[in-house]
UniProtKB/Swiss-Prot annotation:
Active site: 150 (proton donor/acceptor)
Function per UniProt: Catalyzes the formation of acetyl phosphate from acetate and ATP. Can also catalyze the reverse reaction. During anaerobic growth of the organism, this enzyme is also involved in the synthesis of most of the ATP formed catabolically. The main pathway for acetate production during exponential phase.
UniProt-annotated location(s): Cytoplasm
UniProt protein name: Acetate kinase
BP-aspect Gene Ontology terms: acetate biosynthetic process; acetate metabolic process; acetyl-CoA biosynthetic process; propionate biosynthetic process; single-species biofilm formation on inanimate substrate
Cofactor binding: number and manner: Mg(2+). Can also accept Mn(2+).
Gene that specifies this protein: ackA
Length: 400
């Protein structure tokens, strides 16, 4: 077994994803999910040595109970795993402007994560709980905890990409600007695309589409992010599972003034009741939309709006490529599996030289990477993301 084992933690407001990964070869020794925190059905599921197990955490359990269970129950089954841990990597959704790369966690970093919490009110406070609990559970690794920021990869954006056309003082005094998200995923697939296209990363011009329950598109020029669709928060941009993405901001005033909705109700509407769920009025699941596209009006409506928005972003970002677009990359749960989304979206972009090969497109699903374009047309690639590996590698590198 390698001596570069890293515990990767991804704390959400009501869940905790965890894995132990070899940062050298990417092998996963443990993976799992604790979920339904603060509810009677709080539970934990994990896979170790190919065996899947699950257990109840007890009513109302949360991050502390989950980490206790990982340390005292799961890792107790295999003490050599615990003994070989060299670092802990924490996924942090928002690092504000301060963090342009991953950092070893100390008091100032904890304060920085707190300072950015207003931009990620559901996520950052949960990350801080995860850090606090990890420091308690693994005292021997107290100076080996690393924060990996979802916003860091986008910090290379130029001013014209990240500024909103609002009074400049709002940016200077309050940090209101575009930050983006999914940066770790966009970074990973950029590195992988360079290998598949046989080009040095620093010469790579691509558009990366991370499509999951949340979704974002990034423009990568010479290997660096120059624009991305998510904004101050992950609400801007594409149509998502339950998020609206781009809307006319005046809709908010209309909902408030004319329909009498409260600010909290509007926030809930835009973040939890819109997107595919809002358009279908049934589900946020893209599989339903794909499976029922030909037979159900709600599914067709949702898919058409989704792909229209995605194609618009890809088209717009070609303008930032300095005249050379090497490929479009699809990743994330929808990007990797929804062949119809890829085909319909790229079908709108024939003017840019995209032509999807139907068979190749169907083959590149369920964890398989590959080119999905017809021979001789502009490359379109599917690359399964691996954010956990990036987090493990950064944690290992910074604590070596």
């Amino acid at each position: 077994m390698s001596s570069k084992l890293v515990l990767v933690l991804n704390c959400g407001s009501s869940s905790l994803k965890f894995a132990i990964i070899d940062a050298v070869n990417g092998e996963e020794y443990l993976s799992g999910l604790a979920e339904c925190f603060h509810l009677p059905e709080a539970r934990i599921k994990w896979k170790m040595d190919g065996n899947k197990q699950e257990a109840a955490l007890g009513a109302g359990a949360a991050h502390s109970e989950a980490l206790n269970f990982i340390v005292n129950t799961i890792l107790a089954q295999k003490p050599e795993l615990s003994a070989q841990l060299t670092a802990i990597g924490h996924r942090i959704v928002h690092g504000g402007e301060k963090y342009t790369s991953s950092v070893v966690i100390d008091e100032s970093v904890i304060q920085g994560i707190k300072d950015a919490a207003s931009f990620a009110p559901l996520h950052n406070p949960a990350h801080l709980i995860g850090i606090e609990e990890a420091l308690k559970s693994f005292p021997q690794l107290k100076d080996k905890n690393v924060a990996v920021f979802d916003t860091a990869f986008h910090q290379t954006m130029p001013e014209e990409s990240y500024l909103y056309a609002l009074p400049y003082n709002l940016y200077k005094e309050h940090g209101i600007r575009r930050y983006g998200a999914h940066g770790t995923s966009h970074f990973y697939v950029t590195q992988e695309a360079a290998k598949m296209l046989n080009k040095p990363v620093e010469e790579l011009n691509i558009i990366t589409c991370h499509l999951g329950n949340g979704g974002s598109v990034s423009a990568i020029r010479n290997g660096k992010c120059v624009d991305t669709s998510m904004g101050l928060t992950p609400l801007e941009g594409l149509v998502m599972g339950t998020r609206s993405g781009d809307i006319d901001p005046a809709i908010i005033f209309h909902l408030h003034d004319t329909l009498g909705m409260s600010v909290d109700a509007i926030n809930k509407l835009l973040t939890k009741e819109s997107g595919l769920l809002g358009l279908t009025e049934v589900t946020s699941d893209c599989r339903y939309v794909e499976d029922n596209y030909a037979t159900k009006e709600d599914a067709k409506r949702a898919m058409d709006v989704y792909c229209h928005r995605l194609a618009k972003y890809i088209g717009a970002y070609t303008a930032l490529m300095d005249g050379r677009l090497d490929a479009v990359v699809f990743t994330g749960g929808i990007g990797e599996n929804a062949a119809m989304v890829r085909e319909l979206s790229l079908g709108k972009l024939g003017v840019l030289g995209f032509e999807v090969d139907h068979e190749r497109n169907l083959a590149a699903r369920f964890g398989k990477s590959g080119f999905i374009n017809k021979e001789g047309t502009r490359p379109a690639v599917v690359i399964p993301t691996n954010e956990e590996l990036v987090i493990a590698q950064d944690a290992s590198r910074l604590t070596a």
